[in-house]
Amino acid sequence: MCGIIGKAGIGEVMPELIKGLEMLEYRGYDSAGIAVIHNEKITRCRESGKIINLREKSENNREELTGNVGIGHTRWATHGKPTVENAHPHISNNKKFALVHNGIIENAEEIKKALLTSEEFYSQTDTEVAVKLISKFYKTDVISAVKTACKELTGTFAFGILCSDFPDKIFATAQGSPLVAVKGATGCWITSDLGAINEKSGEFYRIANGEICEISKDSILFYNSEGEEIKKSPERVSLTEETVNKGGYEHFMLKEIFEQPFAIKKTVLSFADKNSIKLENVNIPDEFFKDKLERIIITACGSAYHTGLIGKHVIEKLCKIPVNVEIASEFRYSEPLINENTLTVFISQSGETADTLAALRLCKKYNAKTLSIVNVKSSIIAKESDNVIFTYAGKEIAVATTKAFSAQLVSLYALAIFIAEKRETISNQKKQKLLNELLSLPDKINTTLLKTTDKAKALSKKIYKSTDIFFIGRLYDYGTACEGSLKMKEISYINSQSYASGELKHGTISLIENGTPVIAIGSNTEVFSKTASNIAEVKARGAKVFLVTDESEKDASVFVDDIIYVPSTTPEFQSSLLVIPLQLLSYYTAKRLERDIDKPKNLAKSVTVE
C-alpha cells in the first residue's frame, strides 16, 4: 500500500512532508520521496529503505528543498524493483512536472508505444508514463492536460501533481484509489490517509472518481472529468483519533480490507524466505511429524473456522495426513478420539475466544500436541498453547474480520509447507514453487484490490435489493464461499447461505427462483468443470449467477451473468485472492443499504463468553 501526502502552506513544507510520510509507514513501503517547488523549479529527494534515510538526505539538501508547496510518497514496489530510480515522485523530461501515484496503470506499455515513442524513460514504473503523458498534453492549462491524460489511462490511480509554472499549487485526481483534500489552519493538503496531516481540524473533501482538484495555501477548487469547475460541500472534520485512524476511508472495514497486502507481507516474512519456512515458536521434534503424527484437528469459530476449511485441503494435499475441521462450540462438548499423536490447531484472532480456549484445554487433557494461530501475543490461547504461530495483521477495529482472516490463512499455508517438508511428502521443486507463490501473495492481493474494487462496487448494485443470496464452491472454494456468505450476512443483514456446489441438488435448489443471486467461486482446479455444471443447473432455474474466478478461466464469462477475475496463483493459495472481491462485495452491498458496517447489530469483535 503506497501513501500520498501533499501540502500548499504558509511555512516550510519539507519537514511536514517527512513527518507525514513517517505517519504512513504502517501501510508498508520500500522507498520514499518528496518534491518541493523551490524558486519556481521542482527539486526532489528520493531514497530506498527507511524514511529515516530520506529524512537525513533531505536535511543535507535542505536549502534546495526550501519551499511552501510539495508532495511526498511512500512506495511499495508493484512495477519495478525497490530502487531510488523507481521511487516517487517521478518528473517529466522538461522538469516542469512531478507526480506521485497510488494504483496500477494497466495500459502503461501500450501508451509508451502509441503516445510516448519519443520520450526517454529512467525507471521501470507505470507512474513515469503518467507524468510524461500529462507533460505531453500540457500547453498552458494543467487541468486540461490532466483531464486529457486520464482519459488515455486504464486502471486505478490517485495522482498528486506539481507544475513549476504554478509554483503555489498542487493538482490531484483519483480514479478508483482513495484520495482526500483538507483545508486546515496552516494550509491545504492532499493525502491518502488523514493520519498523515498535521492538523487538528479542517474542511474535508473526498476526491471522487474523475474529479480534478487544485489546491493552494487557502483554497481548494474542484473540476469534473470534462474540466468544468464544480462546487463541492465540505465535511467539517475534527481529526480525532478515530477519524485519523480511519485514514481517509469511510469505514474501518474498508481500510482494513486495503491493509491486507501489508498485513500479509508482514505475516509471511515472519516465517518464510525463498528457501524455507521457519516457525520460531513451534517446538515439535521432526520425528513426530515424520513417524508419529496420525491426524490433525483444526478447531475454530466463525471466519477462523472457514480458514480451517480451506487449510484442511491444503494440508491434506501437501502432507498426506487426514485433517478434521471442528466448530469449537461443538468440539468442546464432545469426547474426541485424540491422543499424543494428534496435532490440534486452534485459530483465534483475539486469542481469547471462549469456545476455542475451552477446546484447547480439552485437548491438553488428552495429551495432544497443541498449536495456536493468534493475532495477539499476550492472549490466553497463546500462553496456554504448546506451540504458536503469530499473525501480524495489526489491530482490527471492524467487527467483520478481513485482514486477520487473510493472515490466518497464509499461516495455515506455511504450516502445511512446514509439515510437508518434515514428512518428505513434497519435492524440493514443489516446495520452491510454493515458497515463491507465498512470497508473491502480498503483491497479488494488492493487484486484486486495485483490479476488483470497481467491479465489486458495480455488482453490489445488482444484488443489494435481494432477500436471499447463495454462495457455492467446491473443495478450497467451499471454504471461500462460506466466508463470503458470512461477510454478506453479518454486515448487510441479507439472508445469505453457502453450500458445497454438489449439495445444491440435494434440497437447496428448490429455493432458487427467477432472479435469485448465486455467487459461484471457481478456482482453476480439477473440479472447475463440476462447478460449471452446478452453475448451469441454477441458471436453468432462473438464477442470476456471478462468478469469481482466476484469470486462467477466460472462457467462463459465456455461461454466467457477470464475472470477477483475480490474478492466478498456485491452486493451494488461490483462496487468498478469491476472498478479496467477496469482502468488497459485502462492504459495498452493506453501504448501499446504509448499514452500520463497522459495528453490525448483535455482534461483538471478541466472543469471550460461551
PLM region spans:
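Conserved short alpha-helical segments that host acidic/polar catalytic motifs at enzyme active sites
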Residues: 1-250, 259-294, 333, 428, ...
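Conserved phosphate/anionic-ligand binding catalytic regions in large, soluble enzymes, centered on
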Residues: 24-33, 102-106, 172-181, 249-253, ...
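Glycine-rich oxoanion-binding loops at beta->alpha junctions
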Residues: 68, 72-85, 275-287, 311-347, ...
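Acidic/histidine-rich
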Residues: 153-187, 459, 464-490, 532
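Active-site phosphate/pyrophosphate-binding segments
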Residues: 260-264, 268-297, 387-517, 527, ...
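Glycine-rich phosphate-binding loops that contact phosphosugars or nucleotide phosphates
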Residues: 291-432, 436-440, 474, 521-565, ...
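Generic C-terminus detector
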Residues: 544, 557-559, 569-610
